[in-house]
């Protein structure tokens, strides 16, 4: 089936091979292992009450095109960090989302020199290869996104384990009950429910309600709701379903007052 996800993944395989030729795995692994230690993504989410906001550095999307014309990733990160976000998601896909790994590198440097409150950084991309996990750590990421729909069980488990070996955590993204089952089976401790279907790109918050009810009550993983969240009412709704954090991009970067929107969605108003 020719879907947007399949097109993205086909290009991603080519992109990863190009990067591997440019910087071999062993060289990237050395960079990853000598990078400053990662910050604790999960602890940052748990520390924010009543709900944690993962604020996204996002310039564009395949469905909406460019969202913010005067895109300044460092300024966005500084605004997010200064107004109560718990963590920052950084889109690094170049072709479809106009992101870049250098944004993580720049934001990490901003935090390390004390120019803004230091928050954990999530590399948000279509991760399909161990090289990308190592690359994420080398550039300063503290966590990575793993999309269950894009991975078989063996690869999902391997990428999750590699992230852990490098001191990172993973936001394991699901969209239906079968994907949730698979995520739990490999030991995912942070589950992200994407309210947007990555095949059709339609969005409904009901996806979060449905999957939240399927989480185990004992040793329950952190639950993050992603996509389709634009207002404080949306945040309150998903929180009532047991959500621990929300990941928001479009609503922030398109807001007339970004700082105010961060405070609104993070429950800081």
Swiss-Prot record:
The keyword Transferase does not apply. The keyword Amino-acid biosynthesis applies. Pfam families: IGPS. Pathway: Amino-acid biosynthesis; L-tryptophan biosynthesis; L-tryptophan from chorismate: step 4/5. SUPFAM superfamilies: Ribulose-phoshate binding barrel. GO terms for biological process: L-tryptophan biosynthetic process. Keywords: Amino-acid biosynthesis, Aromatic amino acid biosynthesis, Decarboxylase, Lyase, Tryptophan biosynthesis. Its EC number is 4.1.1.48. InterPro entries: Aldolase_TIM, Indole-3-glycerol_P_synth, Indole-3-glycerol_P_synth_dom, Indole-3-GlycerolPSynthase_CS, RibuloseP-bd_barrel. It catalyses: 1-(2-carboxyphenylamino)-1-deoxy-D-ribulose 5-phosphate + H(+) = (1S,2R)-1-C-(indol-3-yl)glycerol 3-phosphate + CO2 + H2O. One of its GO terms (molecular function) is phosphoribosylanthranilate isomerase activity. Belongs to the TrpC family. PANTHER family: INDOLE-3-GLYCEROL-PHOSPHATE SYNTHASE, TRYPTOPHAN BIOSYNTHESIS PROTEIN. This is Indole-3-glycerol phosphate synthase.
